[in-house]
Amino acid sequence: MMRFYSLLLLFLTPFAGAVAQQGEVFIDSALPEGWNNGDCFDQTMPPDDEWWQNFEDPVLDSLILYASENSYSVLGAMENIRKARAAWNIARGKMLPTFDLGMGWQRAKTSGNIASTMYTEAWEGQFNAALSMQWQADVFGSIYMRSKAQKMLFMATEEEFRAVMVTLVANVATTYFSLCQSVEQLKVLRENVKSQREIMEIVISRYNSGLASKLDVAQSRSVYYSTMAEIPAMQATIDGYRNKMAVLLGIYPQDLAGWPGEECSLPSYMEPIGVGVPAMLLRRRPDIRVAEKQVEANAAQLGATKRDWFPEVLLTGSIGFSSGEMKHLFRSKSLTWEIAPTIKWNIFSGGERLNATREARAALDQSIISFNSTLLTAVQEVESAMSQYKSSVEQIVSLREAVNQNEETLTLSLELYKQGLTEYQNVLDAQRTLLTYQGYLVQAQGGSLIYLVQLYEALGGGW
């Protein structure tokens, strides 16, 4: 019988090696060699790993460090890694034999009304102690392939953790710059309120002297109070960003304790940055690596379903002691043992194995499609972020000049108004225009930093 098993395994093993070969080509089309909007960026250098340090803002650095250690999204991702590791260990453990240790006592009474017992009642007792073993020899690799699939899923979970970190760092930086932008806008409003109040006092003085109309006074007050009305709304916006920051840090807003406060300011950062080439995204972006590991996991699962078509090789056995009396249980004469190698080959399962293979193939094809979609989205996100950052920098240059010209316009119109050489309407228009473009400039400065953060995130975050 053992010779038959050996010949059967020798016959089937070569066929098992031909099942579910790996190495499918994941990428449908080659990645571009460069970026469409890369002329303002350094494509020869990869992105900085700790990119947030380029802003040289210690408050931002401390916020990111605190969030990376305390955010609930990070803690949840770490638990997912633990869960995935346990699932992988379970799958690996199935490649090993299982052992069971059992001890027991049995007592039975035989009937005295049966001829086989010679119409004599009898009591029988038996003590048992045995170590049993069962092992499925993974001759054709089914268990191994399932273990490999779980390993790939575990590695995908590690990449998902990195993706959470990349997103968290980007969210902290974006929220911080949005907060600083709102603080800068609040400063602009307060500075304009101060300037408008001074101008309003000039108009009132001229009105009292008979040099200005009551309409001029009403218009100056209208501008002043309109600007004042924007301050509470901007303060509420600041509070909203602070509350959002608290959530990212994993604390209550009450525990933020003025960190960050109204002293934060937007850093000036317009230096060319390294973006590398599109091919670097394959190794830098964790979401692409997650998709890649899912493809590999599904490929391994497909291999496992194909190997399920081959026989199972089982080995069971036990060794122990059995005796009618406890005092004789562990004597040599009480020793018992059993070994039973088995080959089990399911030749009909109602289409279960066939459809399991089809399902695994569909899952693999779907994951390959998802991989290519993720890759395409990654390239699009980088291109969009580069274009937005480039445009915002150009916009800042123009807006700075616009603000300078409007400041000069306000100064000149006010001087002419004091001399009675122009109407107050010119001063009024200059005030409104200056406030508008100062707000535009702050928005563009904050927006450029946010676009830069989005670019770093699209490039893989460097975590």
Indicate where each model-derived feature is located.
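Membrane-embedded segments
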Residues: 79, 83-87
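Sec/SRP-type N-terminal targeting helices
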Residues: 75-76, 92-93, 137-165, 215, ...
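Short segments within alpha-helical structural elements
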Residues: 25, 197, 226-254, 305, ...
